[in-house]
Swiss-Prot record:
One of its GO terms (cellular component) is plasma membrane. It is a multi-pass membrane protein. This is Undecaprenyl-diphosphatase 1. Disulfide bonds: none annotated.
Length: 274
């Protein structure tokens, strides 16, 4: 058993769990962490990243099980709040499904590199700053108050997250705030919206990578990454909800900009850790 590889897997799990739901681009950080640590082969690393995202999204399902179950059953029972939330999530998921299936692989082939991630981080940071300095009037305080038109627009904005470094969470949270959704509701809606998007994209990626899974694959490495991702994501979700109740996202804007500049530096110097 390669203990160093297990350690790297745990670090990747922590990176995924912490960054998946923050507006700072989990994909960008995972690409950077993988390259800095020379983590696994390119093919195995890609499968690993998809798998640990499942661990992070499982944390959302665990934390919000009662509300999500209410949304699922609301489609059958007709309970108003649950049904409205379910329809909102479905509508918001459609754009990225259509665009992702049509152009997702093309985007990966062209833009999955350090420079693209850095640019996405910097541009996103500037947009977050602008939104926080010019906050729109809030018209949806809770997730259940988000209108169907707002949900559709959030879904359209989420398509931008196909670009590495943009951040799915960043696009949906800031997009929702721009449309008048409260910071807390925008954050929780982003959590929920990640469930169909990440699971759907993940299953598709795993299916397309079945040849890699059939080779000599170290499943213990995968297990460590998923478990660590789940635990770290669960802790992050609880901390973030408490954070946004009192503070804004300006610190993340600065983080994105500084991180983007550092990634550009690493990209042009070829610096690695191990």
């Amino acid at each position: 058993m390669d203990l160093l590889l297990l350690l790297k897997a745990a670090i990747m799990g922590i990176v995924e769990g912490i960054t998946e739901f923050l507006p700072i681009s989990s994909t960008g950080h995972l690409i950077l962490a993988s390259e800095l640590m020379n983590f696994w082969t390119k093919e195995k690393s890609a499968v690993f990243v998809v798998a640990i995202q499942m661990g992070a999204i499982a944390a959302v399902i665990y934390e919000y099980w009662s509300r999500l179950w209410g949304a699922a059953t609301g489609m059958v029972t007709g309970e108003e709040k649950g049904r409205h939330l379910a329809i909102s999530l479905i509508l918001a998921s459609i754009p990225i499904v259509l665009v992702g299936l049509s152009f997702g692989q093309t985007v990966k082939d062209l833009l999955f590199n350090d420079v693209a991630v850095a640019i996405g981080l910097i541009v996103g940071g500037v947009i977050i700053m602008w939104i926080e300095k010019n906050p729109p009037k809030v018209n949806a305080v809770e997730v259940e108050n988000i209108g169907l038109k707002q949900a559709i627009w959030i879904g359209l904005i989420q398509v931008l997250s196909l670009i590495p470094g943009t951040s799915r969470s960043g696009a949906t949270i800031i997009g929702a705030m721009f449309l008048g959704v409260s910071r807390k509701a925008a954050t929780e809606f982003s959590f929920f919206l990640g469930i169909p998007v990440i699971i759907g994209a993940g299953l598709l990626d795993l299916y397309q990578s079945h040849e890699v899974l059939q080779t000599s694959f170290d499943w213990s490495v995968l297990g460590v990454g998923i478990l660590v991702s789940f635990v770290s994501a669960l802790l992050l979700i609880r901390a973030l909800v408490a954070y946004v109740a009192k503070r804004d996202f300006m610190v993340f804007a600065w983080y994105r900009i500084v991180s983007g500049l550092l990634i550009l530096l690493f990209a042009y110097t070829g610096w690695t850790i191990w």
